[in-house]
């Protein structure tokens, strides 16, 4: 358990503010700059590379993707069958929703009376219509055995639907009906549909020999390689797989994969060839180069496959295949995933782009392959492959070659043109050694005057952010990745000073104005920076310097809101927290109570009203007024009278309340609330240091320290000066809280490090203030309040350790 706490403390040193239960995206962990949608066959979209999902979706997974609507290819086949006389909505009802009763009425009476209005179409009374209806009646009879429609009734932990189990007599009876219908049907399209139902029925019923026989005797003789042919072939492939004829099954799945759009994913999911011998046999069974290419691409999707090797295999048999383009894009994105990883800002060995030795070797082989492909001139889409090569050069850090190759591309494809421009400009950015005004203007003209940021813009900011750090332009480096909230954890004075100069600069360039407006939403940017600088000094207890900067801030400045997710409304909502960033701070920050909880309201959290003895402490303060009050309290605390004792007590309360275990622990970290701040949990009594950063893409870090000794000293001084036993009792009890924090801060005594010896938490050795409280102040009213509300003290009195 002790190691867990140590890990938390170490993690806090590289803190970045995130939602506690936020979803982490691997697709979002790198800059994807190459558009996979450049491939010629868009039906392959599900097989674009994605790390977050099993299959790629254009609906929101990729900035370059356009939303696609699912097409029902079966309905399109029905539309052709009825010579486009019925629309897709009418056909959808006819095929999927019509009742057996209505269809039977039409078939037997040859009339449309007494049926659903949607079915009242004269075309259903034609010979084609009647044969279609008779087929649907048979299909609906087969449906329970072929689709998942029944709830599982076994005792396993499975709650999904299952297919109805089929007995041999049920199969024989249903197949006989299909045989008779097949023989009686004249239209070959409907005969093919009946044959498909019989192949599927046999396959799902476990009668694999019958499935293969039906395909050979009912499907093949029709000589119709339409969609239903491939639907039937897929069922035959499943039967072959069940018979452990893996090569034959793989070959059939590859043929269906190549010739259909809607069955690509199921065929990929069903494709199982685990050894080279079976794969070689499947290749020999292929009738066309494209079928061979489909086999290679199906194998290439597996994680164990080498994408470049499969590219070479596909190129050898079908150099113009879209599968080659697909495998090339997948391989390139894998290389981007390695090279363009968003850097860890605290990694001393970081470089960007980043490529390990194995990745570099693979990239150079890909470059050589693409150069050879272009030289041999076997492919028609020269513009695609030139664009691809230019991007490989970009990945390899050969920026001049990337720009030169991109400039040679001549294309009428707007997507190719957009990609080559993107690659060329990213190469230009990568080649920059310093960022000057001319470079900034060029960047502004290309990106920053656009309304929506792209992944490319993120890449550009990555390069800029690091170069700006090297140029010691900290403000611009910081704003490449952050708004002011990136400073809340560290209050980095160097960045704050540079930001004050930058934001206050006159005659800003277009680039500089855009950088500020994109990252800083505030209308009072300078005021917020002055507040940050003041708080930097306040956190160091340098009150005089803090006051200088707070005097530049409007007294009612407020910029923090509590942000939470409303699951009912599916939206984030903002509410007021206990701290708005600058103003409306309760005088309770100087107060105390025996037992305070983080989820208390301010009114619930504190009960002591000693602070009301000081007229200069307002009920509600801003930071300037708070610092002014503390300066006065510190002056008074140097005295020897009762007011001096009270001043020491209030100062102790302030330092305790703003410590990591106090109600206002959020105060110096700009959190609107004090709840769920696990990143603050730390026992270090001196501030941690932050390593030299590669960039600021995770903010400026987190600097924490917990100093209960300061509060303790003020409480002890208050007790020593005061002549009021009630105030003495309060001071001693508050000091006992500090004792516990000090106990935890010593080496092996962190929260889980005291060996689960809970008695240490209330023993005299750990809490000597408990003994002082018992010995000296047991007659006070506050002592009785402590007895009633503090369990630690109750245990101390009980065990007298």
Task: Give a label for each model feature.
Residues 4-13:
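Sec-dependent N-terminal signal peptides
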Residues 13-21:
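Bacterial Sec-dependent signal peptides at the C-terminal "C-region" and cleavage site
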Residues 20-200, 205-801:
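Extracytoplasmic/secretory-pathway proteins
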């Amino acid at each position: 358990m002790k190691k867990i706490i140590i890990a938390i403390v170490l993690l806090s040193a590289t803190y970045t503010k995130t939602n506690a239960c936020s979803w982490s995206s691997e697709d979002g962990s790198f800059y994807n700059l190459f558009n996979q949608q450049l491939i010629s066959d868009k039906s392959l979209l599900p097989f674009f590379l994605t790390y977050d999902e099993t299959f790629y979706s254009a609906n929101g997974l990729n900035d370059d993707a356009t939303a696609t609507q699912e097409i029902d290819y079966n309905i399109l086949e029905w539309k052709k069958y009825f010579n486009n006389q019925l629309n897709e909505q009418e056909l959808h009802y006819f095929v999927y929703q019509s009742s057996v009763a209505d269809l039977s009425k039409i078939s037997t009476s040859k009339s449309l009376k007494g049926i659903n209005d949607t079915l009242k179409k004269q075309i259903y009374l034609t010979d084609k219509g009647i044969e279609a209806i008779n087929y649907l009646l048979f299909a609906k009879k087969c449906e329970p055995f072929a689709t998942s429609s029944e709830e599982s009734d076994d005792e396993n932990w499975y709650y999904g639907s299952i297919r109805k189990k089929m007995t041999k007599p049920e199969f024989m009876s249903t197949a006989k009906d299909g045989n008779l219908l097949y023989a009686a049907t004249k239209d070959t399209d409907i005969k093919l549909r009946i044959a498909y139902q019989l192949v599927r029925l046999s396959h799902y019923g476990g009668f694999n020999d019958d499935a293969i026989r039906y395909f050979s005797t009912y499907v093949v003789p029709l000589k119709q390689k339409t969609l239903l042919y491939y639907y039937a072939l897929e069922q035959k492939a499943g039967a072959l797989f069940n018979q452990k004829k893996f090569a034959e099954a793989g070959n059939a799945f590859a043929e269906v994969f190549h010739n259909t759009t809607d069955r690509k994913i199921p065929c990929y999911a069903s494709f199982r060839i685990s050894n080279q011998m079976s794969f070689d046999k499947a290749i020999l069974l292929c009738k066309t180069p494209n079928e061979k290419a489909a086999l290679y691409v199906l194998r290439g999707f597996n994680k164990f496959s080498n994408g470049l090797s499969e590219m070479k295999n596909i190129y050898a048999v079908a150099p113009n295949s879209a599968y080659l383009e697909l495998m090339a894009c997948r391989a390139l994105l894998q290389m981007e995933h390695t090279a363009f990883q968003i850097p860890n800002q605290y990694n001393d060995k970081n470089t960007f782009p980043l490529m390990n030795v194995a990745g570099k070797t693979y990239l150079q082989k890909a470059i050589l392959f693409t150069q050879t492909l272009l030289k041999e001139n076997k492919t028609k889409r020269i513009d695609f492959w030139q664009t691809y090569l230019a991007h490989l050069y970009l990945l390899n850090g050969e920026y001049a070659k990337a720009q030169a190759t991109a400039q040679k591309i001549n294309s009428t494809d707007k997507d190719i043109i957009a990609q080559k421009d993107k690659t060329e400009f990213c190469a230009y950015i990568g080649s920059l050694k310093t960022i000057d005004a001319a470079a900034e203007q060029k960047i502004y003209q290309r990106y920053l005057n656009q309304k929506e940021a792209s992944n490319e813009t993120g890449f550009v900011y990555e390069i800029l952010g690091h170069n700006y750090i090297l140029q010691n332009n900290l403000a611009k480096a910081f704003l490449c990745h952050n708004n002011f909230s990136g400073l809340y954890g560290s209050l980095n004075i160097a960045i704050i000073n540079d930001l004050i100069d930058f934001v206050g600069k006159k005659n800003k360039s277009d680039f500089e104005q855009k950088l500020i407006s994109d990252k800083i939403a505030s209308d009072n940017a300078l005021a917020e920076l002055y507040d940050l600088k003041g708080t930097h000094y306040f956190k160091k207890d340098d009150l005089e310097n803090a006051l200088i900067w707070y005097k530049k801030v409007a007294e009612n400045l407020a910029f923090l809101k509590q942000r939470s997710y409303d699951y009912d409304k599916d939206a984030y909502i903002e509410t007021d927290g206990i701290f708005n960033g600058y103003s409306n701070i309760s005088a309770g920050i100087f107060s105390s109570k025996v037992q305070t909880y983080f989820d208390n309201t301010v009114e619930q959290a504190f009960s002591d009203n000693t602070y009301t003895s000081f007229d200069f402490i307002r009920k509600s303060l801003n930071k300037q007024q708070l610092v002014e009050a503390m300066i006065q309290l510190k002056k008074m605390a140097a005295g020897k009278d009762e007011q001096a004792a009270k001043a020491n007590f209030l100062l102790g309360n302030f330092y305790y309340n703003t410590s990591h275990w106090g109600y206002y622990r959020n105060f110096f970290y700009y959190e609107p609330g004090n709840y769920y701040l696990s990143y603050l949990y730390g026992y270090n009594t001196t501030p941690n240091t932050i390593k030299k950063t590669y960039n600021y893409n995770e903010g400026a870090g987190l600097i924490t320290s917990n100093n209960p000794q300061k509060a303790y000293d003020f409480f002890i001084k208050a007790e020593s000066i005061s002549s009021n036993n009630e105030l003495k009792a309060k001071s001693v009890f508050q000091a006992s809280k500090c004792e516990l924090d000090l106990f935890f801060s010593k080496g092996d005594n962190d929260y889980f490090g005291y060996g689960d010896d809970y008695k240490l938490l209330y023993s005299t050795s750990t809490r000597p203030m408990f003994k002082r409280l018992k010995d000296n102040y047991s007659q006070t009213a506050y002592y009785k309040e402590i007895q009633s509300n503090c369990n630690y003290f109750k245990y101390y009195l009980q065990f007298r350790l």
